[in-house]
Amino acid sequence: MPELSYREAVRDALVQAMRVDEDVFIMGEDIAEMGGSMGVTQGMLDEFGPERVRNTPISEMALAGAAIGAAIQGMRPVAEIMYEDFLTLATEQIVNQAAKHRYMSGGQVTVPVTFRTQGGSGWSPGAQHAQQLEAWFVHIPGLKVVFPSTPTDVRGLLWSSIYDDNPVVFFEHRTLYGIKEEVPEELEPIPLGKARVHREGDDVTVIATGRLVHEALAAAKDAENDGVSVEVVDPRTLQPLDEAALVDSVKKTNRCVVAHEAVVRGGFGAEVAAVIQYQAFDWLDAPIERVGAKFAPLPFAPVMEKFVVPHANDVLDAIRRTVGRDGN
């Protein structure tokens, strides 16, 4: 099997979709000659030309609106929002237009647009280039929200997002672009709404997203030294959410930790905790633990950034608390 980085897997999904379907095109700020801020689309201009690899003005609302219009007319645009923080500038179009047209038209109008964006900590980007805003969009009926954590998943889920007839907000974490793994020779679409169990265990379920999937896996290895068997589950798709997979795991382990890089208060983990509380309360042997960033803008200074966002040791501490081995 070939080995691809997360970045290469994103590009591969885009290239393959554009090769087989002329209705698929990409657009965004500096995505053509420059290849985007993270280099994901490098070389695609040479193969597909400026009509299908379209640089846009520096206006997220304008590029989102243009992408939505193209989708309504039957195209399948993939619009890159350079930084996740800049989704705030496109929110009117994504939330009030893309998410609403299918409902308002009684299903007569579909909006098959994918909004790719990236964010997160790890390289000291500062407070305005590193937010994790997935919870905002999970709250909006009509949107699908995807957050892959591995090259295999990002490739298969991006393909499925492009060919979904609903608008998808597709989150990528910048620190994952360099990770590599073997992927299937042929691209295998992954259905939206299906979670993935990365590691099986018996004592605690850790439900994690994005970068925190990898932190959770590291914490699970450390927990073995305590004699604790940890199951790590990645929802992959935040909306629709594979509630059954999450609940089944917690019913097996009887304990749950929810981890994400976004701020804890109001984060996606609160919704996951509510789902577990409603559907698996009688199986819980301990309170649900939540892990996330502190309630503060992300600092520019690397040492302060590391202090604000969660890491493997924070997940491990939560695991120990939920099994009663935190030393207290």
What residues fall within each predicted segment?
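Thiamine diphosphate
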Residues: 1-167, 171, 306, ...
